[in-house]
Every structure is written in C-alpha cells, then in structure tokens.
C-alpha cells in the first residue's frame, strides 16, 4: 500500500490543496518520450463541500479549471506525475452526481504549438531545448518548462523545418538513429538522456509467479519494409526519399508505407525520419504487457526506460519471451486506500545497445 497525494496547483505554480481522499477510480501512467496521463472521479457534492471549507465555495472553478490548473501526484513523498487538467465530465444518477477529471502531461501542451526550426551542426539536446525555449518567448506561450540536465553522449544534427508541431518534432528527433530520450518532470524540468532508465540485472519477473497476468499480440498489421518519405512541397516538387529492408521483404513479403513530413525541407532530415520509421516497423511487432499486484513490484525502485528480465513459462509459443526487456510504459490503478495494480509494457528493440548505454551511466 502506497501513500498518495493528489495536489492541485495554480497557474502561478503554487500548491492549492490535496484531494486524494476524494478520488475514485484513479489511474495514472507514464510512457517513454510521451506525456503522463491521469484520470479519476469525485463525488461532486463532497468535492464542493471540501473546497468550500477551503474558501473556494462561491466559484468551484476558482479552485480547479480545465486548461489552467495543474495536478501533480505524489507517491510516498515523491512526485511521480505532472499534468494539466484537460477535461471535466459530469454524470448524474438518482444517488449522486460524479465529476470525472482527465489530465495529461505537460508534453501534450506542445501538440498545440508550432515553430520554424533552423539548426546546423548542433547537439540534438540543444535543438530539443531550443524549440521549447522558442515557445517560451512567444506571447502567452511560457508554460513554465525550464531546462534540466542531459545524461550521456552528444550527437550533432541539422534540422530545418517550417511550422512544425513541437511535440511530434521532439518525438521524431528521439526516434532517429542515436536519438536521445527526453522527459518533462512533474516540476517542469526538461531532461534529455542518451538512454533513459537503468540496466537492472537484479530485477526479474516470471510467469507464473510475480506476474499476475500478461497479454501481447504478434502482428504484421503495421509492418512496413519499404518506406516512402514525403517532405515539404507539392506533387513532384516535394522532397522525397525511399528506404527499404530486403531481409524483411524476403521473410514476410513486400509491405509499403508512405510517411509524410510536411514541414521537412531537407533531404537529410527526411531520410533520417524515414529510416527511423523503417527501423521500428520492419519486423513483426510484439509489445508484451504484464500486470503485477499486491506489492510484487516496488514502484519506488523502478521507472520508465529501465531494463529488467522477463520470462514467460509453460508454453512453447511463449518461450521466446525470456530475456531483457525495456519498460516503455507504466500504468497504475489506485484504490482509495493506496492499493495498486501495476501494468508494465515492454519492448526489446536494440536492447543490447540500450543496455550498453545504461551501463555507462
């Protein structure tokens, strides 16, 4: 059982109150190179009584409002999730009125921001920070994110793009060969890593045993071994490239994809992006998810990006799930007492390279 606090924060970055005791059906998640997520329900009458006692009774939206207030979650005294409120939902019945709260991590703010990028021979972590800093300097655009630290090696890159959405720019730069991971922490620091997380040979989960349940698909539905990259421009004037993998074509036939990057003006950048798509989509896809319960895994001791040992026993079709996998996402359901059900999703793409980078830290 963990001790949780669900803190509402003001737009001027001040804590306003803890509402965990009101939360029902709470769920939070963290995903590598993506936004945190948080959702929960409250009984509207209890909620309004509570904030009235705090001095917010005349206008409930003065305490918590969509788009304005942040919610930060503490677990055992440590901040684990930082989000901005995106949506309230209201549902009434004969017994009660419930308000659902949905909040998403700070990275999703940059889904609504666009910049023009011109960088030459620049460290990729500086390029990433540069687009956020550009957003900060626009009128009404300073979301409070500040630069944190970089861990690991540095790679120099060129980037020239027009009116590019910032979130996808950061994610695409993380996916190219030798791209770096990134995160925005609950206190709004932008950190970059050669490879986020730690190599954890001491941590091992098996089914049956520590793993309560698991699921995964093995699919070629989204496989592509020929990728046509289309950049800025119209028709034949557009910047274009093609990359392919003959080994994959021989194994599972030719499978094509068009990847559009309308803001990309340089062929080198376009080829890097198309090659990244090919790398991650040329083979049948498996992303094992496991669920652990009743404290079988200490969330204080594991995080997104960590590499741990996973083994599924009992059936020949599962025997290949036996080795080191990297945690891509952590999703946690929390009851009113702090009991948790934890779901981890993994992949093993480039796992030996990831381990070597994590061991070097």
Which stretches of residues belong to each language-model region?
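Oligomerization/assembly interface segments of phage tail-like spikes and tubes
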Residues: 30-50, 96-108, 229, 282-295, ...
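Acidic, small/polar-enriched beta strand-loop surface segments
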Residues: 2-7, 171, 199-336, 350-361
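Hydrophobic beta-strand residues in large extracellular and virion-surface proteins
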Residues: 4-8, 40, 71-73, 85, ...
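Envelope-exposed proteins and targeting segments
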Residues: 36, 81, 97-99, 187-189, ...
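Charged- and aromatic-enriched interaction segments used to assemble
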Residues: 94-220
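Short, conserved beta-turn/loop elements at beta-strand boundaries and strand-helix junctions
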Residues: 88-94, 330-337
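Well-ordered beta-strand positions in beta-sheet-rich domains
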Residues: 79-82, 100, 114-116, 202, ...
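Beta-strand-rich assembly/attachment modules of structural machines
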Residues: 1-129
């Amino acid at each position: 059982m963990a001790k949780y606090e669900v803190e509402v924060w003001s737009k001027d970055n001040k804590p306003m109150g803890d509402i965990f005791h009101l939360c029902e059906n709470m769920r939070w998640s963290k995903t590598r190179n993506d936004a945190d997520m948080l959702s929960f329900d409250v009984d509207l009458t209890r909620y309004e009584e509570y904030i009235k006692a705090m001095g917010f009774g005349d206008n409930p939206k003065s305490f918590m409002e969509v788009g304005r207030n942040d919610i930060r979650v503490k677990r055992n005294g440590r901040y684990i999730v930082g989000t901005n409120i995106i949506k309230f939902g209201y549902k009434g019945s004969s017994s009660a009125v419930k308000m659902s709260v949905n909040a998403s991590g700070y990275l999703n703010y940059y889904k609504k921001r666009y910049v023009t990028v011109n960088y030459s021979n620049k460290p990729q972590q500086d390029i990433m920070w540069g687009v956020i800093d550009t957003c900060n300097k626009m009128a009404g655009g300073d979301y409070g994110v500040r630069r944190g630290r970089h861990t690991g090696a540095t790679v120099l890159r060129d980037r020239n793009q027009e009116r590019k959405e910032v979130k996808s720019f950061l994610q695409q730069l993380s996916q190219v060969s030798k791209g770096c991971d990134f995160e925005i922490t609950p206190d709004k620091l932008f950190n970059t890593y050669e490879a986020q997380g730690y190599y954890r040979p001491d941590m091992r989960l098996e089914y049956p045993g520590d793993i309560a349940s698991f699921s995964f698909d093995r699919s070629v539905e989204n496989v592509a071994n020929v990728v046509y990259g289309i950049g800025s421009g119209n028709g034949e004037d557009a910047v274009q490239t093609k990359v392919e993998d003959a080994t994959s074509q021989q194994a599972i036939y030719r499978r094509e994809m068009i990847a559009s990057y309308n803001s990309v003006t340089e062929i080198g950048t376009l080829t890097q992006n198309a090659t990244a798509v090919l790398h991650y989509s040329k083979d049948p896809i498996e992303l094992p998810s496991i669920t652990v319960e009743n404290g079988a895994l200490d969330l204080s001791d594991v995080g997104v990006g960590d590499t741990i040992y996973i083994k599924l026993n009992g059936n020949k079709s599962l025997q290949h799930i036996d080795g080191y996998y990297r945690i891509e996402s952590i999703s946690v359901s929390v009851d009113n007492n702090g009991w948790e059900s934890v779901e981890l999703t993994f992949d093993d793409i480039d796992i030996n390279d990831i381990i070597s980078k994590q061991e070097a830290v």
